[in-house]
Amino acid sequence: MSEPVLSSLRIEPLNPSHLARCRVIAESGALPRFQAVLIGDWLARFEQRFPDLLPSRSPRCLVALDEDQLLATVVARPYNRRGTCWTLQLPELSGETSRHSLRDVQHDLLLEALQLGAPQVCSWVIRCPASDADAIALMRELGFQPLRPYQSWLPPQPSASPSSLRGIDPLSWLPITRRTAQLLWPIEQVGNFSHLRQITDRHWLDLLDRNAPGCGVLVDGETVLAGCICLTESSDHGTFELLRDVAWDPRLEQALPVVLGRVLQQGALRSLITAFDDAPLSRVLEAQGWTRGGEQLLLGRSMWRRHVAHRNLQLSRSLDDVFGRLRPQGSPLPNPSLGPRCLGPR
């Protein structure tokens, strides 16, 4: 009796007919977002077909269907321009009743999403609330491992007119460009250990894709103190990440309130992500009225193959074979005698 129920669950790429039939998407106001994802899904197929010509930027979307009823959707996005690492969002449930358990729907949907772009895609990452034990257990079942915790912050009400950095010379707030992205890149990488850097396989050019209104870099000449980038892989739109150098600069206590005020004024910021154990930064945020949200956990799954060097047979020959070439091949010549020589009869 259970086989017909299980066989009725289908996983398909998002297409226009799904949007036309899904009443929940239209009523929730998410139709424009799914239309943009649908266009991105078409572009992503061309990007994955020509990876050497087109950088990977467009998302892919899969839907779970029970007959003609849409149960859930999942969006996958490139995490780098190379297309070697992608990020998943937790499946978005439509709220429709189903004969299938929600865990089965999420499991099958995510399992199918992990096949997108193979074999080019070598690793995956996903962000989960640390309090969502079910989601973390599901991702662990699919081969994901915890990589790094983050702290989420909810913003205060923005002020009418943000302050200026003129009193904190020579600091300046610059937009993210090719030059400032290269300056920010070491700070973005210093908080990630080597295994995480291997999984994400990113380059400083990938920071350009995380630029949005309100993002920028706080610099003192050629030295970067902090930066703010947009998390495009987050399911919560309007999520920004605040980065800073490992060494705490006392000027950040005055500069960060000004910077965050500009981000609130210019960008549609709904939440801010920081390092989980950054106590000095947490004190500055709390003093400015930011409230702690939930803890987030970055999980990753790597399919990189460790390259084992093959033994070079030419270098593994025995010493006898090597020195054998030095041995004489013919009869040995007599050694000269050191005694008196007889040149003839006396």
Region spans (language model):
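Active-site/acyl-donor-binding loops of N-acyltransferases
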Residues: 2, 129-131, 141-164, 271-346
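Amide-forming acyltransferase catalytic core, primarily the GNAT-like/NAT-type
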Residues: 3-76, 141-238
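Structural motif
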Residues: 14, 74-75, 91, 127-130, ...
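Short, structured motif recognition centered on aromatic/hydrophobic residues
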Residues: 61-62, 85-89, 110-114, 124-125, ...
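Conserved acetyl-CoA binding element of GNAT-fold acetyltransferases
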Residues: 83-101, 235-250
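Conserved GNAT acetyl-CoA-binding A-motif
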Residues: 86, 117-129, 265-277
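Conserved acetyl-CoA-binding loop-helix of GNAT-fold acetyltransferases
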Residues: 98-115, 141, 249-264
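Intrinsically disordered, low-complexity segments enriched in Gly and acidic/Ser/Thr residues
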Residues: 221-271
